[in-house]
Amino acid sequence: MPGKKAPNGEFAGRKLKLKRKKFRWSDIRYKRRVLRLKEKSDPLEGAPQARGIVLEKIAVEAKQPNSGMRKAVRVQLIKNGKVVTAFCPGDGAINFIDEHDEVIIEGIGGPKGGSMGDIPGIRYKVVKVNRVSLKELVKGRKEKPRR
């Protein structure tokens, strides 16, 4: 039978499976997962959290229809020197963070590892400042250690 491409014998199962596998490479999600492209391009290198040094404090304008300045910091990661922007959650949280402080950042929890809500282009949030939880500092339960 001319033009027939798939084997169809009694013992052709292995060959059929191998043939199907080739087509998976045209699926972008499969390709990215198998080649581990997310970890390679991710500043945190696949880790859940990372340590960094605060370079500067910045305010980012919220997306429409909201208005207001969302407080964030530019952080240089210790493990690879990459610079990322991290959001400071909580009322007055930015006042507990100074330049050259050591912070721990983690993903902000947006869809597909992206930004969240009305904060444009910020994928990370500050969790700890000088080894003290930012949440505790904001609530007033703990004090920032003096150097």
Curated annotation (Swiss-Prot):
Belongs to the universal ribosomal protein uS12 family. The keyword rRNA-binding applies. It comes from the Archaea. The gene is rps12. GO terms for molecular function: rRNA binding; structural constituent of ribosome. Part of the 30S ribosomal subunit. The lineage of its organism: Archaea, Methanobacteriati, Methanobacteriota, Thermococci, Thermococcales. This is Small ribosomal subunit protein uS12. It comes from Pyrococcus horikoshii (strain ATCC 700860 / DSM 12428 / JCM 9974 / NBRC 100139 / OT-3). One of its GO terms (biological process) is translation. The keyword rRNA-binding applies.
